[in-house]
């Protein structure tokens, strides 16, 4: 399988306080998007949409030498960015990784019972494909990765060894290699589990950043599900290296 990378960046990764090894887009990068090109959309009257950014495919897309000093800033009230690309994300099977560099803006965000979403392209009710990646303090602080394995819904929880801090950059990485699914924070392993079968991250729904990706859905109390992120996202990359590593 051809190696495919989707890279989104807003600051030069060499300045990150988190370990940056392996984060630079390389010669296999086929799509690149700069967070700074978008301002934040916001849900209004519980029905609005955020801004849309189209990923432009290109051969050997380079990381720009001069980048803005800030990433995409989210207010936690419904602002988000939507990624439009054919089939949402072309990561269908084999080994993969998802990397996110972020920092939280408030203590209230980290204590919020519902947690927050970083990126995803499926709703809670979709079972056979797509993914969600976020944070939850419910029954212990953890990162949550919801996905589909052989057409069945699965959830991978990675408990935090210590609380997140506001104003600090973190590198979060979800990775599958062979039969191991792992979660790392600043290159430190948080959790690992064995998986056998095909994980399908692709979904026809566009991936949304900084919010629950199906903003029309409501909870049992008929409240709109938002769980918006409050903070800054600086870098996101998807890598599909396939079973043969090519």
Regions found by a protein language model. Give the residues of each.
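Sec-dependent N-terminal signal peptides
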Residues: 4-13
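Extracytoplasmic low-complexity segments
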Residues: 5, 18-78, 87, 93, ...
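Extracellular, beta-strand-rich glycan-interacting domains
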Residues: 31-39, 97-106, 215, 223-246
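Beta-strand-rich interaction surfaces with strong enrichment in secreted/lumenal proteins
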Residues: 86-88, 159-163, 196-197
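Short, aromatic/His-centered strand-loop micro-motif at the edge of beta-sheets
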Residues: 146-171
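Localized edge beta-strand/strand-to-loop motifs within extracellular or lumenal beta-rich domains
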Residues: 168-182
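Flexible glycan-contacting loops in extracellular carbohydrate-active proteins
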Residues: 193-232
């Amino acid at each position: 399988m051809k190696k495919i990378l989707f890279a989104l960046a807003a600051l030069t990764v060499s300045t990150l306080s988190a370990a940056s090894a392996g984060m630079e887009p390389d010669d296999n990068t086929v799509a690149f998007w700069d967070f700074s090109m978008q301002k934040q959309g916001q849900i209004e009257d519980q029905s609005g949409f955020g801004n849309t950014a189209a990923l432009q495919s290109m051969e050997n897309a380079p990381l720009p030498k001069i980048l803005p000093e800030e990433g995409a800033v989210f207010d936690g009230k419904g602002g988000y960015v939507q990624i439009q690309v054919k089939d949402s994300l072309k990561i269908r099977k084999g080994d993969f990784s998802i990397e996110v560099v972020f920092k939280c803006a408030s203590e209230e965000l980290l204590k919020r019972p519902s947690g927050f979403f970083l990126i995803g392209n499926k709703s809670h009710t979709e079972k056979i494909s797509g993914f969600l990646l976020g944070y939850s303090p419910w029954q212990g602080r953890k990162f949550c990765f919801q996905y589909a394995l052989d057409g069945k819904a699965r959830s991978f929880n990675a408990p935090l060894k210590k609380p997140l801090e506001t104003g600090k950059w973190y590198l979060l990485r979800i990775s599958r290699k062979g039969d191991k699914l792992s979660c790392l924070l600043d290159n430190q392993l948080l959790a690992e589990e064995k998986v056998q079968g095909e994980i399908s991250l692709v979904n026809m729904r566009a991936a949304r950043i900084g919010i629950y990706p199906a903003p029309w859905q409501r909870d049992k109390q008929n409240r709109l599900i938002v769980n918006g992120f409050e903070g800054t996202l600086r870098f996101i990359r998807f890598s599909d290296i396939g079973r043969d590593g090519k």
